[in-house]
Amino acid sequence: MQGKVFAFALALVFGAVACKGPHQEKAAAAGASQAISGVFSSQELQAFTAVDPIDTHAHVFVNDPAFNAMIKRLNLHLLDIVVVDDQDPKLKDLAAESQEGWAFVHASDGRAAFCTSFDPFKVRDRGFAQSSIRWINQEFDRGAIAVKLWKNVGMEIKDAKGNYILPDNPAFEPIYKDIAAHNKTLVAHVADPDSAWAAPNPASPDYAYYKENPVWYMYGKPHPASKQQILQARDRILEMNPHLRVVGAHLGSMESDFHEIAQHLDRYPNFAVDLAARMPYLMMQPRADMIAFILKYQDRLIYGTDNNIFAGGNVQAKMKQWEESYARDWRFLATNDTLEYKGRQVSGLALPDAVLRKIYHENAVRWFPGILPASR
């Protein structure tokens, strides 16, 4: 991993860490010498469901009774997110993809909300902003609560001169203004981990991903936008739109530098980050530093996974994979159990119950108005 380690003075947090719930006391009593994995135990499931968990970063494109039953059993609520990806045949057609997502939302018995998007590949078309806003507003009328800006802006799409189009391109500004005017949230996945711009490193958490998805591996490409350029463009969106709620997906793509995340959260009150698919980066930091960081920014960290499921796949296998991911994250955040990551053992953070409730539930409700059905 590259970047700096985030360090805090810990004196102010020890009292809060000492306030353990039953799931933490159980783990402390049992000890944590052996790494734990797999799906939830009955005790773990009881503790997990009690926080009313919300996964604010999921991609669901099936309407399967067994899958829906699993979501209910885990007492989960989801934000179902669409993107336009010209590299994936399943994600090229925004209208068709959205229909599949809405079908799941409508069948979820109020357990899913919808995050729409727009087609950035049309950015050079005449009337791009107006047609995108028209689509987005139609989705708002259907009940969408957020809009996704994806990493192909900054890492793939180019202008007529062959330059990478960045997130603060003027063509997008009317869209951001419209989202803010409707009191919706922008989910911004811009840039990727540092390893996308670095020489191959098998020790990186993302090594396998870039081997399988070379289109996003910027190292060695001619004249790519740097990660810093892309994130600075994101920051200009925050500055130009102070009333726009922005959730930076994947720790805001600042996963290697928790000091930088902290600076952004201090500087931009309209900015929060989700934890989706970046839990390994938390595990790689010193435990005490992560506890201090999370306690300080407990109102700005939102739980998400980036779990996905598509039609035509093995639903049962995916269900097991989903539950194992929720169980692994819960053990790391909520208990002092020992987990194994890349051949080494990692101790859970055993966060206080009130902090877990914020990360898993309260922050999602505040940063994504409408994520829960009005009847709750």
Kindly give the residue locations of the regions a language model identified:
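Hydrophobic faces of well-ordered beta-strands that scaffold small-molecule active sites
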Residues: 54-58, 78-81, 112-116, 147-149, ...
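An N-terminally biased module of ancient metal coordination in phosphate/nucleic-acid-related enzymes
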Residues: 22-111, 131
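Active-site gating/metal-coordination segments in enzymes
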Residues: 44-46, 95-218, 269-272, 279, ...
